[in-house]
Design a protein with these regions (language model features):
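N-terminal secretory signal peptides and thylakoid transit peptides that target proteins
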Residues: 1-12
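N-terminal cap/lid segment of alpha/beta-hydrolase-fold proteins
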Residues: 18-48
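Short amphipathic alpha-helix adjacent to the substrate-entry channel of hydrolases
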Residues: 69-87
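Gly/Ser-rich "nucleophile elbow"/oxyanion-hole loop immediately N-terminal to the catalytic nucleophile
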Residues: 114-130
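Hydrolase active-site cap/lid region
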Residues: 143-187
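Short beta-strand/loop motif that positions the catalytic acidic residue
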Residues: 209-211, 215
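C-terminal catalytic histidine-bearing segment of alpha/beta-hydrolase fold enzymes
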Residues: 224-266
Length: 266
């Protein structure tokens, strides 16, 4: 964990600190998809020769560089144990050079597209690929699905910031949505139209929208609004679950989360 990540974790509630400060698990391989230091992915592989289904996973952290892909490593390892390869994407985040919305979204597309050469090398089944993401990563997973840059069987946003206008109104993350997009919905409506999952509907791949009812970081209201607006989404409310329970394999709800992530792949 970097010093920046440690300081960011110290600002979280105690239950969240317990999770995000866990020592990260080592992936089978780390593969660059670009020249910037943040343009890489960690690949977690299941046992066996394959071909393996694959999950493109996008971590959260309010799009800020204080949070890295490392805190998603336990989720990735758990999914690999269950039989899926996981391509855990890192990407430029706010605070990194070139990390405005254009740079961040560009990284997500290029990182996802790089799954093709990765699949050829590691015998992954490109007909059984889904995207999943947590918090800000859930927004990016939905955005990726809307671009149709890669063929996805489904998309699973976990506690996602799936309504950027609502997130701006609530000033989530200290007003991070305005920082990400360079202003309010009234000031830069075209940027919200390009980035907000609510404004990108309909999204073709089916969506399983998971959210904890006790999430005090990203309220379930955002997922409820998105699932209601989407004709291709099902909301899965997880009673009593907090924000980080959805990516913590030690949590009571993890079996339900894993089931929904892998439902289209086996």
């Amino acid at each position: 964990m970097t010093r920046r990540s440690f300081l960011a974790a110290a600002c979280l509630p105690a239950f969240a600190q317990d999770f995000v400060t866990l020592p990260p698990l080592k992936a089978n391989d780390r593969i660059a998809y670009g020249k910037a230091a943040q343009q890489f992915g960690d690949l977690f592989l299941p046992h066996g020769n394959g071909p393996h289904p694959a999950v493109i996973f996008i971590h959260g952290g309010f799009w800020r560089n204080a949070y890295t892909l490392e805190h998603a490593s336990h989720l990735c390892a758990a999914l690999a144990r269950a039989g899926a390869a996981v391509w855990n994407l890192e990407y430029r985040r706010l605070g990194d050079p070139g990390a405005d919305w254009a740079g961040i979204s560009d990284d997500i597309v290029h990182g996802a597209e790089h799954l093709v050469p990765v699949a050829n090398r590691y015998n992954l089944d490109l007909k059984r690929v889904i995207a999943a993401g947590h918090s800000a990563g859930g927004q990016l997973a939905l955005w990726l699905a809307a671009q149709m840059a890669v063929d996805l069987r489904g998309v699973v946003p976990l506690a996602a910031i799936s309504d950027l206008r609502r997130a701006y109104a609530l000033q989530l993350g200290g007003g991070v949505v305005g920082e990400l997009l360079g202003g309010s919905p009234d000031r830069v409506p075209q940027r919200y139209a390009a980035a907000d999952p609510m404004e990108l509907l309909p999204i073709s791949p089916p969506q399983r929208v998971l959210h904890g009812t006790a999430d005090n970081i990203v309220p379930i209201d955002l997922s409820q609004r998105f699932a209601k607006a989407s004709k291709n989404a099902k909301l899965v409310a997880l009673p009593g679950a907090g924000h980080f329970d959805l990516i913590d394999p030690r949590s009571k709800i993890w079996p339900k989360v894993q089931e929904n992530i892998l439902r289209w792949q086996f």
